[in-house]
Amino acid sequence: MNQEKLAKLQAQVRIGGKGTARRKKKVVHRTATADDKKLQSSLKKLAVNNIAGIEEVNMIKDDGTVIHFNNPKVQASLSANTFAITGHAEVKQITEMLPGILSQLGADSLTSLRKLAEQFPRQVLDSKASKPEDIEEEDDDVPELVGNFDEASKNEAN
């Protein structure tokens, strides 16, 4: 090809600029249900089995937060060493769940809990502690025992 024809063809080709049509890029919106279907199909390939009867799952992280699942769907594949936990998750502090979670804590979590308790400021504990005045007011609501009811029931039995 000669240079004149090549220059003429290059002048005709317009890549961008004023007057050219825009190419619209298609945006694919992914929904949560589509992601869930993909996840379930991947789990099906692993041959997972449902585990029934699990009321709650707590995942304790190193920073003292807990990922808490209430009534989750738990699936396991022992051959792939994989557990899938699906459901509504809540992120909570370990102090919020303390009375019920103590039996689930391991030795390392208990030591981190001790450290957390030592770091917990005394001011918060003092402000939450009930004052003696408040205790006396609560006692006023309870009526005092006037008579002995055990004797009356014994007399009726005789």
UniProtKB/Swiss-Prot annotation:
Residues 123-158 are annotated as: Disordered. Belongs to the NAC-beta family. PROSITE patterns: NAC_AB. This is Transcription factor BTF3 homolog 4. Residues 33-98 form the NAC-A/B domain. CDD domains: NAC_BTF3. Residues 134-143 have a biased composition (Acidic residues).
